[in-house]
Amino acid sequence: MKNVDDLIDSAAELAEHGLSKGEIADELNVSRETASWLVERAGGNHTDTETAATTSTADIHVDWSALGRDSTRLRYAASAMADLLAKQGEEVDLTVGIEKAGAPLATAVANQLDTDLGTYAPAKHQWDEGDIDEQGGGFSRNFAAIRNRDCYVVDDIITSGTTMRESIDAIREQGGEPIACVVLVDKRGYDEIDGVPVYSLVDVVRVDREE
């Protein structure tokens, strides 16, 4: 995808397949607000582009499909992510992937670090509009349980930090202790979230120039 029109078309296609706006945000690696805007644009419910640019918060789309579609490349990326975590805690025996895209990354990271694997489905996957606090996430029972264990948390992109913060809270509610988080790309440049160190292969900083 090279431009906004491509993203709008992709958002429309995903919406037609029944994905919620939160799931569309996850698929396109943008914020929930951006996903909602793209879907509205696809439906013809939009303002002039210039007006939209001045009234909405800009976002950055990240396409890492060149890694995701090739198992060897994905393994190499996960190896680098695992290396960032390697010195964080010798007692860590569980890696939690945030669904959807964080799960395959976490699988490869867990393999590198020889830990068990868990997955967490965030609340945004159920979100279409309104207050996301009315939705709830959950851990898959098909994978390892938290059970008061120290954990690493893995995702692909940090856009606002909301999903990572939710995942950290959910782990703590289960009695677990998040030791560190790692992502491919961090759009916000976090050093930590709620006291948990955050590591990324790439930090993205948006620079706005005022003429």
Curated annotation (Swiss-Prot):
InterPro entries from the xrefs?
GcfR_halob (IPR053401), GfcR-like (IPR022854), PRibTrfase_dom (IPR000836), PRTase-like (IPR029057)
Give the molecular function GO annotations: DNA binding; orotate phosphoribosyltransferase activity
Keywords carried by this UniProt record: DNA-binding, Transcription, Transcription regulation
Q: List the disulfide bonds.
A: none
Question: Domain text from the record?
Answer: Contains an N-terminal DNA-binding winged helix-turn-helix domain and a C-terminal regulatory domain (or effector binding domain) resembling phosphoribosyltransferase (PRT) domain.
Q: Which family does it belong to?
A: Belongs to the purine/pyrimidine phosphoribosyltransferase family. GfcR subfamily.
* Stated name of the protein: Transcriptional regulator GfcR
Q: Which organism is it from?
A: Halorubrum lacusprofundi (strain ATCC 49239 / DSM 5036 / JCM 8891 / ACAM 34)
Source organism phylogeny: Archaea, Methanobacteriati, Methanobacteriota, Stenosarchaea group, Halobacteria
In the UniProt record, what gene is named as encoding this protein? gfcR
